[in-house]
Amino acid sequence: MIDKIKSNARDLRRNLTLQERKLWRYLRSRRFSDFKFRRQHPVGSYILDFACCSARVVVELDGGQHDLAVAYDSRRTSWLESQGWTVLRFWNNEIDCNEETVLENILQELNRRSPSP
């Protein structure tokens, strides 16, 4: 099962959506306020769109087909929160139309979850 999840994550990394690519431009290589993110990162039996493991923050992008997955996402979010993660969800059109606000919201949560020096 673990090998299957890792294989699926690898495939998803190769086939990011346009909005995932746009967001990854900011989050990759510690470009985003020096926070390290992983894309399509497996946690338990789930694959997270973007994860900052040090702050335990998950960023998920949802598209139009997403309305069909509400119950699944609710279970998934509950499980992740029980494991100490905070899950931030954004619609793809928010990345397209309001990218700066999305980035501000992510940074605000990262700063809130990170220990002060």
From Swiss-Prot:
Pfam families linked to this entry: DUF559
Q: Which family does it belong to?
A: To H.influenzae HI_1162 and to HI_0925.
Record InterPro entries:
DUF559, Endonuclease_DUF559_bact, Restrct_endonuc-II-like
Identify this protein by name: Uncharacterized protein YcjD
From which domain of life does this come? Answer: Bacteria
Instruction: Output the lineage of the source organism.
Output: Bacteria, Pseudomonadati, Pseudomonadota, Gammaproteobacteria, Enterobacterales
Listed NCBIfam families: PRK09767.1
